[in-house]
Regions:
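Surface-exposed loop/turn segments flanking beta-strands in extracellular/periplasmic regions
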Residues: 1-12, 149-158
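Generic, ordered loop/turn and secondary-structure boundary motif
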Residues: 3, 113, 136-139
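Gram-negative outer-membrane beta-barrel transporters
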Residues: 3-95, 174-176
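C-terminal beta-signal and adjacent terminal beta-strands/loops
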Residues: 86-95, 120-177
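Short, glycine/charged-rich beta-strand-loop motifs at protein surfaces that mediate ligand recognition
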Residues: 102-108, 115-119, 126, 158-159
């Protein structure tokens, strides 16, 4: 129960209710022979009792949306894939006032998008590929609160709700045995 006291990790039996309801819908459509589109949406309603109050679970995105497109050339030698992922915002644990009078962190984190893409060249028994993840370059602004003083009372390394790495690129070879 992080909302009770930011300096303590309280592990005890739940005194109240908790639940997790998820609704998901997805669809895939072949627009034409070589192009497949997929869309998905997931809505999360996750709550638990904190300090006697039924509240939204912290650090949990309210929704996630996904859209993918995959195109393979008619000869099957080239394939390009792209993904757009929308991550909904959510609640942060209860903030507190720092010694300088400012708030430790915002009450909520905002929604963000991520884009990834990959290009593949297929051969008879192997393939090569290049791609990138998090092409928008979005990262969580503050990943470790109080990082300048890891022994201080305001040090907090566990409030991760989004990407901590920026754009990443990769290349590789796949061998079919």
């Amino acid at each position: 129960d992080y909302d009770s006291d930011h300096r303590l990790i309280c592990i005890d039996n739940l005194q109240g209710r908790s639940y997790s309801h998820t609704f998901q819908i997805d669809a895939s459509y072949v627009l034409f022979k070589s192009l497949t589109l997929t869309a998905a949406y997931r809505l999360n309603d996750v709550k638990a009792t904190y300090g006697g109050i039924l509240r939204e679970r912290p650090l949990t995105s309210k929704y996630k949306g996904l859209f993918t497109a995959s195109y393979k050339t008619p000869d099957g030698r080239w394939q390009v894939d792209g993904t757009l992922q929308l991550n909904g915002g959510g609640r942060m644990p209860q903030p507190y006032q720092l010694a300088d009078g400012t708030q430790s962190w915002n009450r909520r984190f905002k929604a963000y998008e991520q884009v990834s893409a990959q290009l593949t060249r297929w051969f008879k028994h192997w393939s090569v590929y290049v791609g990138g993840e998090n092409l928008t370059g979005f990262t969580q602004h503050t990943t470790i609160y109080g990082a300048d003083n890891p022994w201080g009372t305001d040090f907090e390394p566990t409030l991760i709700w989004g990407p901590v790495h920026g754009r990443m690129f990769y290349a590789g070879v796949r061998v079919n045995i």
